[in-house]
Amino acid sequence: MKLLISPAKSLEFKKELPSKITTTAVFEKEASYINSVLKEKSPQHLSKLMSISEALAELNWNRNQVFKTPSDSTNSRAAIFAFNGDVYTGLDAYSLSEKQIEILQEKLRILSGLYGLLKPLDVIRPYRLEMGTSLKLDAHKNLYSFWKNKLTEQLNMELKEGELLVNLASKEYFSAIDEKAIQNTIVTPHFKDFKNGKLKIISFFAKKARGMMVRHLIEQNASTLEDIHSFTSAGYAFSSTETVDEMNPIFVR
């Protein structure tokens, strides 16, 4: 089983690390190339390109100027301990055991606008580049065009025969993969909450639940659809009545 999640805009580079083991991103050369393009953009251009404030644009301009591949130990860390959004709160990688981190490294992949595809322990530097950013790269009109074939081929290479690919990424990031060209079965869990008498996907809760699902599947060293269905964290439970397509299981609370 392989699991896919999105990165996070919020980063954490100061918290003490539970493990100093790191690996190297498979698309580090591509990350270096993309940064070389970003490096030429002024703070004003970055602000417009990324729809961010002047202060954030200045911060990321500075990040782009000092970006290095391969990363050294200065201001860099394993991706799973660097991203700090709702999904990562739900996962809580800092409290995983050494054995669970090994399973996480084998099963989890993080989609990234800059690095393409990351293993949890792949070392990264602080950056901001969402997959939906309209950044032109040579003949490619945007990041989707740049990454689609590369990411799809890499995933097909990593997936073993019969292995499930569990999509816990956002639509923005999963769209960077050519879903029809993936050779394995894709399972996309959905998380819904009752609100005002109706079942709805509430973004904050759904994101956190995706992270909790990752943790559940790591703790179980999961491999089957039944392992996915057994998820019960934070009051969620698999609903066979709400689930119409078994490749899109729905969890409710």
Set out the residue ranges of the language-model regions.
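Acidic metal-coordinating catalytic centers involved in nucleic-acid phosphodiester chemistry
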Residues: N248
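Internal, well-folded beta-alpha domain core
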Residues: A93-D245, R253
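Active-site helix-to-loop segments that bind/position phosphate- or nucleotide-bearing substrates
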Residues: L4-S95
